[in-house]
Amino acid sequence: MKPPPSSICTGELINMINKFELHTDVLVVGSGPSGFAAAYTAAANGADVILVEQCGDVGGISTSGLMSHWTGSCESPLYYEILKRTSEKNEGKFKNEITNIIDPEKLKTLYLEMLDEVGCKLMLYTFAVDVICNGNKILGVTVINKSGKTDIYAKVTVDATGDGDVAARAGAEYILGRESDNKMQPATLMFKVGGVDCDRAIFLGSFESTYETPDGELQALAKEHIPYPAGHILTYKTTRPGVVTCNMTNAVDIDGTCADDLTKATLTCRRQMDDIVKYLREFVPGYENCFIISSASLIGIRETRHFKGKYTLNEQDILEAKTFDDYIVKDAYFNFDVHNITGAGLDKTGVQKHFKQTKGYTIPYRCLIPETKENLLLCGRNISGTHMAHSNFRVMPICVGIGEAAGSAAYICATQNRNLNEIDAKEIRKIIGI
């Protein structure tokens, strides 16, 4: 028997597979913390919701990305509920203890349980490949998975892809990365090590953290012994005995919207892991017998597209803790966190050191609305903001707050047949409870 022809191009293969059609009130693309929050909130309030996710788990960087902990904060009832319900699932000394430490396996299960409770339809292993438009009006998204292609028509589409893939394909205006040169923050592949003596272990949780040993200071030793562009130590406690999460790989000059660059970044980071473990064993107290037990299936992309919204949040807004009339996130707090775009550590220009947040700030609803597109909401780190402002609001708790707002707005618009631009932020805040 002759083998099937191998010259059929991808486009021809796609055209040969099954085609389906679905209709829903709200379509959320991407199930990271912001996408989960948007889908859960919209469904909990009574909207029919479909949540599309390319990975095999809900949670994005918080689960598939093996994130160590929730960092940053905002006033978000849903975020607090996640922490509370996670504590109930934790075991041992962390049982019923509210902590920002993440157990990715427990969190995966919790996300699924919560979505099931509110009747959200979930489509895993599914990629958004095109946008269905009528002029500037977004009608839905075309997705593809093992079953074939599906046109999903929605009254409101929420882009929670992190990179703004839906908005970009719809033609929404954006810039990549830093305004001056379009360079973006580096990528990281998280991993965990076991065999750690946690009673003796050193945990350095920031680039500014240092620790002197007989062999030298640990950050300096990391720069010396871990090959560039890695060269720092960031280690975090877990809820598991003897297990530590490492945020220590580093890939620079990466465009997270480019598949080739994502592959390159993954290979770069994975090749660094053995050298990192060797460094930990040789120089860091408590890690003498450590070994890799797991690594992320999703690489951590910190920055890609910044969209032009009805309003673009800037660093001065954050520094002044401006209270916008149309705020939908309040008391957002983090530091300006620009990782070194050319190597390990923080941005070598030190520019973020000139920006010190003193109190919580607000995010206006207008940042979620692309300037020229209808029926589409930006959600999570791809809302409208400058490079520097983005380095502050990109963290997961703040993204959960943004997701709650997006889900609330989508619910109102879809179930009351209203335009996203007509919604008063007070209505959104009332639903969220802030």
Model-derived features: where do they sit?
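N-terminal Rossmann-fold NAD(P) dinucleotide-binding loop
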Residues: 35
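Conserved hydrophobic helix-helix packing surfaces used for dimerization/oligomerization
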Residues: 26-28, 49, 376
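Beta1/beta-strand and adjacent pyrophosphate-binding region of the FAD-binding site
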Residues: 20-32
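Conserved beta-strand-loop-beta-strand element in the redox core of flavoprotein oxidoreductases
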Residues: 132-151
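Cationic, low-complexity basic patches in intrinsically disordered or flexible, solvent-exposed regions
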Residues: 3
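Conserved N-terminal/central alpha/beta ligand/cofactor-binding core
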Residues: 10-15, 41, 47-48, 52-134, ...
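Membrane-embedded transmembrane-helix bundle of lipid-linked glycan/lipid transferases
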Residues: 27-29, 38, 43, 136-137
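Flavin (FAD/FMN)-binding glycine-rich loop and adjacent Rossmann-like elements that form
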Residues: 61, 82, 125, 145, ...
